[in-house]
Amino acid sequence: MALWGGRFQGETSALFKLFNDSLPVDYRLFEQDVVGSIAWADAIASVGIITATECSDLKKALNELLVEVKGDPAIILASGAEDIHSFVESALIAKVGDLGKKLHTGRSRNDQVATDLKLWCQSEGAALVARLQTLRSELIALAEREFDAVMPGYTHLQRAQPVTFGHWCLAYVEMIERDFSRLTDALKRANTCPLGSGALAGTAYQMDRHALALALNFASPTLNSLDSVSDRDHVVELCSTASISMMHLSRMAEDLIFFNTGEAGFISLSDEVTSGSSLMPQKKNPDALELIRGKTGRVYGSLVGILTTMKALPLAYNKDMQEDKEGLFDVVDSWAICLDMAALVLSGLVVNRPNALLAAQQGYANATELADYLVSKGMPFREAHHVVGVAVVAAIAKKIPLEGFTLAEFKTFADIIEDDVYPNLTIEACLAKRDVLGGTALTQVKQAIAAKKAG
């Protein structure tokens, strides 16, 4: 049953119905639509539109419908309804007859769907918050296990300075915490109830919208009916937050894919999150990480899609806004599975310490230490930088590490170099000197892990 029709004399085209109907997408709002309808029944009862008995009958029927659909979700799509609101109303009328036709009094699908969608965002958002917390915990646990595993740090994908794997893990903890902050902030802004805003001008019935908002666990009602029915900022913000978080997950995936290559060999991935080749028997591919990286693009696409849909819409509601859900649902599904998969990858990850240490000892990652040593002897840093650059060229030519030079050879670069240079060029010294807040010294990494565990 359509929720409109009296204005029309001709039949709706079958093609238009297929084009216009949103049930194949918005069926996911069923529970929110029923919950909102139960609250609305109380609201219209409070202003005398229905009696207390009628309200009780409506709520009983709606709760029965909720149980029935949870037992057999397929009945929604099998109904052929235009949208989830039409399905719920038709099913309600089938249960209670003409009483069901009273429920929509004072309500529009415009404020109804806006409320449903915010309720859905709140519910799914809470689950995403929990997933972010789980991933954060896995990163901290991995950082604690491997806090002192030495590996090369990179800039421009060139070996730069030694760091620890624990320090690397903590970098992504920082990113995940920012994702958590963005998501919780977005959910706070979405915690307002549009119900009672009508089609665009507000409902004609003097109900208590504050009570209605609280009944649906919103912090407060929205304050402008035009904005209430046309606002999709919560969709944009959730897609934006997901996009930033997926960017972080993709960067982490890229790092781990590289660390897992035969050329690097810093880590091994569990069989749980890898797959093989149909042709090459030796292959163990990091498919979980590659899919995280790949799904990031589709999340970005949905963000651009909703921004583009909304950018030129006049107030208030327009049918364009029906396109707000498919992308959002896909974003939330993609983000959720990627968060789960990232946590699973980390839980089974093993650091190959000898390989990672060997790589850190190569590539002249201690060159900065030699420059700092020269500075400690009184040489200006810019001059020291040049001297060490010359020394690196010479070391490359001789195929030796910097610490492979004899003292006499060192003195050809700068005669202020003494025997005490050698202790400064060890990996241990490189790490220990970064003993500053946020640094990679083992003392700092341990303190950071302790702080994260406490928080």
From Swiss-Prot:
Alphabetical list of CDD domains matching this protein: Argininosuccinate_lyase
Gene Ontology CC annotation, any one: cytosol
Keywords linked to the UniProt accession: Amino-acid biosynthesis, Arginine biosynthesis, Cytoplasm, Lyase
GO biological process: arginine biosynthetic process via ornithine; L-arginine biosynthetic process
Pfam families: ASL_C2, Lyase_1
Entry's EC annotation: 4.3.2.1
TM region(s), chain numbering: none
Compartmental location: Cytoplasm
Broad EC category: lyase
Main localization category: cytoplasm
GO molecular function: argininosuccinate lyase activity
HAMAP family hit by this protein: Arg_succ_lyase
PANTHER family the record matches: ARGININOSUCCINATE LYASE (PTHR43814:SF1)
Protein name per the record: Argininosuccinate lyase
Annotated organism of origin: Shewanella oneidensis (strain ATCC 700550 / JCM 31522 / CIP 106686 / LMG 19005 / NCIMB 14063 / MR-1)
Gene name in the database record: argH
